[in-house]
Amino acid sequence: MAFRRINNLELFIKRCSAPTLYYSSIRTATGNNYSNNTANITTDSSSSSNNNSNRNNKNDNNNEDNNKFNWRSLVRFFVPFSLGAVASSLVMKRDDLELTPTISAARPSGRRREFNFIADVVGGCADSVVYIEIKDTRHFDYFSGQPITASNGSGFVIEQNGLILTNAHVVINKPHTMVQVRLSDGRTFPATIEDVDQTSDLATLRIQVNNLPVMRLGKSSTLRSGEWVVALGSPLALSNTVTAGVISSTQRASQELGLRNRDINYLQTDAAITFGNSGGPLVNLDGEAIGVNSMKVTAGISFAIPIDYVKVFLERAAERRKKGSAYKTGYPVKRYMGITMLTLTPDILFELKSRSQNMPSNLMHGVLVWKVIVGSPAHSGGLQPGDIVTHINKKEIKNSSDVYDALGCGDKELNMIIMRGVKQMHVTITPEDP
């Protein structure tokens, strides 16, 4: 009965995932059997024939003993194995308790956490930045059947109920178009223009959606030259793009930039701003918008409208909304040419000539074309980004206001003299009526 129970115990150990223990005990027993047989054969070799029966009896007895379960081998292997398993489980439980906070932590440590202040700024305000598309309702994509994108820009949410701030030149003076806004989460909504101030180049849009993340507005009056700033937007239609730099100047007068009828001291920054950044926020390290990205002259020289001036525009726009005045009745719409331009002041000309060898040395005035909308009259007429307009219909062009005057004079065609690098060229543009 005892031998049967031992055999049952061996079978239980073998079936219950202890093969190593089981086979170790069997191998030990087999090794003892082999040693005993070898000793018996050596001892009994001298009396070969006379002791055959005794040797057979001894071998039978040894085999019977070896077939019994070796308790000493079992204890030798089972006890350390059990203690190790218990200790391992305790260590695993302890490690789980200790490692849980570390695994769940998402923030980096060390120098990444200490010096990545730009990432902290972006994480707190990027969700409020939007991508603005101007769709041409007269031309449609061959494959999708959707209106093609005529232009694009940026903006940011300033009220949870869908009010968005951007540049005026992003959304107006583009006939036969519709405005679409894409949020940071990918949702797209049609937008309507609520208010426009062409003098300050500011506009507000409205989309029909609530509970949007809002950009906090800071104070541009407290800025100092050298402060870190972050520009967010969609340059070249690449949404959710982040660039960083410093404030180069907090008091860049509009007269220095050749912008007449604008009493604005622009913020100058070396943060990379290019096509599509217009209307996006310039943010301080507290995650507050301190400016609206407006224009770029060259690499390292860009300008933003101070947020203090923007707040005045927003207050006046709110008053106009209460009175029910609409954007179309308050602001005349000019003929459409499809360019974004910048007056070349003497200081800007000097800077451009020092940076590029393609600037003609005898150039004294003009307007820099730094963006041409695809499909626009300017694009069809042959204007390219980087061209400098010096004359329109035989009249000198000294600033951007001269170009606006030429658009409003009623001439059907605009015959331009431009500088493309060091070459002088003639182009003819037929503006579209509003």
From Swiss-Prot:
Annotated Low complexity bias: 35-60
Active-site residues annotated for this sequence: 169 (charge relay system), 201 (charge relay system), 278 (charge relay system)
Predominant localisation class: mitochondrion
Region listing for Serine protease, in residue ranges: 151-314
Positions of the UniProt region annotated as Disordered: 34-65
GO MF terms held by the record: serine-type endopeptidase activity
UniProt name for this protein: Serine protease HTRA2, mitochondrial
Location(s) in or outside the cell: Mitochondrion intermembrane space; Mitochondrion membrane
Subunit structure: Interacts with th/DIAP1 (via BIR 2 domain).
Organism field: Drosophila willistoni (Fruit fly)
Family, per entry: Belongs to the peptidase S1C family.
Catalytic activity: Cleavage of non-polar aliphatic amino-acids at the P1 position, with a preference for Val, Ile and Met. At the P2 and P3 positions, Arg is selected most strongly with a secondary preference for other hydrophilic residues
Residues of the PDZ domain: 337-424
GO biological process terms, semicolon-separated: apoptotic process; ectopic germ cell programmed cell death; mitochondrion organization; positive regulation of apoptotic process; proteolysis; spermatogenesis
Pfam families associated with the record: PDZ_6, Trypsin_2
Keyword Calcium: no
Origin organism lineage: Eukaryota, Metazoa, Ecdysozoa, Arthropoda, Hexapoda
Membrane topology: Single-pass membrane protein
Enzyme class: hydrolase
